[in-house]
Structures are given as C-alpha cells and as structure tokens.
UniProtKB/Swiss-Prot annotation:
This is Bifunctional protein GlmU. In the N-terminal section; belongs to the N-acetylglucosamine-1-phosphate uridyltransferase family. In the C-terminal section; belongs to the transferase hexapeptide repeat family. Homotrimer. Keywords: Acyltransferase, Cell shape, Cell wall biogenesis/degradation, Cytoplasm, Magnesium, Metal-binding, Multifunctional enzyme, Nucleotidyltransferase, Peptidoglycan synthesis, Repeat, Transferase.
Amino acid sequence: MLNVVILAAGLGKRMQSDLPKVLHSLAGKPMLEHVLDSASQLEPGRIVVVVGHGADRVRGAYEGRAGLSFALQQPQQGTGHAVQQAVPLLQEDGKDDVTLVLYGDVPLVQPDTLRRLLQARGQGAAVLTELLDDATGYGRIVRNEQGQVQRIVEHKDASEAERAIREVNTGILAAPTGRLKDWLSRIDNNNAQGEYYLTDVVGLAVADGVPVGAAQPSAGWETLGVNSRVQQAELERRWQQEQARRQLEAGVTLADPARFDVRGTLTCGRDVFIDVGCVFEGKVELADGVRVGPHCVLRDVSVGAGTHIDAYSHVQQATVGRDARIGPYARLRPGASLGDRTHVGNFVEIKNSVLDADSKANHLAYIGDADIGARVNVGAGTITCNYDGANKHRTIIEDDAFIGSDTQLVAPVRVGRGATLGAGTTLTRDAPAGQLTVSRARQTTIEGWQRPQKKS
C-alpha cells in the first residue's frame, strides 16, 4: 500500500501574499495541483495533504478530489512534526506498505523520478538527492566509506567538513510506513532550529539496520522549490523552456522558444508552426500542418490538419476542422464548432454555434447560439440577436444561404436553404428557402433639399 504525504502548511512569508503559497500558480495551475497530479500517477492508496496557514482555503480548493485527506499542523514545528500529523491517516495492508513524502512548494518533480526513488529503497528507505556546485542552505547527505547513506545533516548544524559535501537532500523521502511511524515518534528538536526534522529518520533507520538508498532526479529543475515571487518566476521560465524543448524534439517549429507558454498540455502533429507570444491553456490538440500566428491564446481546443490561426486570435473550448482560416483578431468562445474549410475573419466572435463546412464569416460579426449550414456566407456586421433579456434563443441558417451585410437576425428564427437576406435586414420571422428577404425601409431621395448652414 502506497501512501503519499504532501507538506503544504507553510506560510510563504516571502511571497508577500494573502494566498497560501501552495495555491500560487505555476504553468497555469496551483503548485499543489502539480504535486497532486504527479502523485496520482503512482496510484497511491491514499494521499494526505498536511495543511496549516490558510488551511481552509487549501481544503476548499481540493476537498472534492477523490482519495484525498487532510491533516492539520498547528503550530508549525518542522517537517518531521508535519508528517507526524499525517500518521493517523496512513493506511497499511501488510503488502509492502510505504509512505512517500513530497512538498507542495516543490511542484515539478516528475512521476518517473518518484518511481525510481521507490525502486531505490528496496525493502528499506530512500531519499532523493542532488549534486550542487553551491550547496549553501541545503541539508548534506553524509555517506560512509562504502558509499552508503548514513544521515542527513542540516546546513546550520553541519561542520566545516560536512558543508564541503556537494550531495544535498531534496527533502523527498520514501520509507516503510510502519517503521516511519516509529522513527517519527523518536525524533527530537535538539538542533539549531529547535524543530523536528524529517531528515532525522534517516539516521534512525541506519541505527536500526535499515538500508537507506538514494536516487537522483532526471533534471535539476524537478526539485527546485518556490519561496518567493522571484523563485516562482524563475521556475516558470525553466518549466516553459522544458516545454519548448519537448515540442522542438517532437518536430514542432517554434519561432522563438523563449516566447512560448504552455499552461496545460499541448499535443502537436507533424509540421506544426507556432509563432511568438502564443499561450496554450488546458488541453490543446493541433493536428498536422497547423500554423498558429503571433500572440494567440488557445484554451481547451482541438484544431484540424492544415488550419491556420492568424495573429491575436482567442480560441476557447472550441473545435476547428481541417484547412480552416481563423483571424486575425478572431474570437471563438465555448461551444464554437467550425467545420472543414471554414473562414472566420477579423473581429468575428462565435459562441455556442456550429459553422458547417465551407461557410464564411469574414468580417465584423457576432454569431451566438446559431446552427449554420454548409457554404453559407455571413456578411460584415451581421448579428444573431440571441438574448431577450431572460433567455437565449437559437438562430438556424440552412445550407447555401447568403446573409447580407449589416443584418440582424432576431432569434428564434430560421433562414431556409439557399435564401438570401438583403443588406441591412432585421429578420424577425423565418426567411423562406431560395427567396430574397429584405426588411429595410425603402430608399427615398428628397429633391431640392439643402443641408442646414451654420448661422454667421
């Protein structure tokens, strides 16, 4: 049975914020959520989050998440004391029970690294370590002449010889659950900080004859913690650099990898091109040959092969077919579904609407709550008037219709197949198929009329 304990009780004073530190965002989601997602991939029997400062807000953010429990650390008296608060919630079934300790402000540790750590422990304990050129402030890994881990000494408690050690403790640890409970009951706060150190369980394990293994992360950024806005920004950049590297290695062309942000997951086909300043949020899928112009924002979208999305377009919770042309300055809102070879041009907004294959809305239009068939032309300035002040109503435009410029369609209303609406029409009743419908006032010329002149 695998238990995961995530320490998330810290104040985060240097963040200069009322928001609990672990709820601050990294790559589009709270730091704690990154840790929860990585832990969940290990399929633990239970995850316990130890909360303290801002406990109610942290609980409120994740209370409904399956398999999650909370323990309160009050007051905060060190990492060992924090894990002690989780002890009553740890589960054991007698089958290789193990507890993994993670940190809510170390958000980017990867599941593969955690799997290696669990393997490294064998039947004993294991710590995740790292080699640093400058180890100032970190706990040092002290090994014996045979290279076996003996203990961890915190920087403030270390001798000069121990401070010369480059291998440091990341704080992440795995240990047999039953033995961990025993070791936690035996640690004390006889140290420079006056706190109960989780690291002391390593020395207790060695004293009890329990082997302590070690593993290293695949990349140094995995174990970087966040204690300030500066560190948050630095880690954000490191993570975005990693995202860019992965996309480049997968064959995506990035106009500038330094100006590229993924705040979720981005899946790309072959020969995708992404220009500068683009942001991808949630789950985004780009098929083969998609081109995304500069400064676009895509959130929870699927884009078909060969589609071009031009500059400054925003696409959210929408689907776009093959070989479509979107933008520049287009906005697709939730529920927009565009078919193959559709065109949505500058300053066109589409919400909760279907635009079937080969239909076009190239200029200055609002299409909301509409079902538009194939090969429809929507003229500039067209508006579907979908809201009556209380309820939304749908507009239906059948195949091959032509909607003239500056037209208002007052829903609920239907435009029949092949119908034409004259420019300036305000449509309040259904337009019959194959006919021209016009509702604007008749043009009049007043002969002899003179424009008023200013009085001198």
